[in-house]
Amino acid sequence: MIVGIGIDIVELERIRSLLERSRKFPERILTPREKAQFGELPPARQAEFLAGRFAAKEAYAKALGTGIGRHLSFQDIEIVSDEHGKPSIAARRDGETVHLSISHSRDYAVAQVVIERLGPMTPADACHG
């Protein structure tokens, strides 16, 4: 059963501008492992990577229903890639599967997250469905 859906779109130019103004911006968004990946990329690719991670984390927070804020930070969410480059959310709650898609164009990065709970629907789920 789907229990959350989130989507986010980011303008690459906005991320490029933030990177030019503050090299500390990636530290707010990326976990240490993500920052290591970011640092290995050529500068032209860094804004695209950061925009995709930003959009994915925002989409996940929206799917959870909390958004980024007091109870959930960018540092609480880590995007990892498998051996084929497919991204996924590293932290998961028990009994849930998280589906993540990140896409880029010349001007935008977009991410969509679907959170699926495995097993039968509970009475609490029925109230929210």
UniProtKB/Swiss-Prot annotation:
Keywords: Cytoplasm, Fatty acid biosynthesis, Fatty acid metabolism, Lipid biosynthesis, Lipid metabolism, Magnesium, Metal-binding, Transferase. GO terms for molecular function: holo-[acyl-carrier-protein] synthase activity; magnesium ion binding. SUPFAM superfamilies: 4'-phosphopantetheinyl transferase (SSF56214). Gene3D superfamilies: 4'-phosphopantetheinyl transferase domain. It catalyses: apo-[ACP] + CoA = holo-[ACP] + adenosine 3',5'-bisphosphate + H(+). Coiled coil: none annotated. One of its GO terms (cellular component) is cytosol. This is Holo-[acyl-carrier-protein] synthase. The lineage of its organism: Bacteria, Bacillati, Bacillota, Bacilli, Bacillales. The gene is acpS.
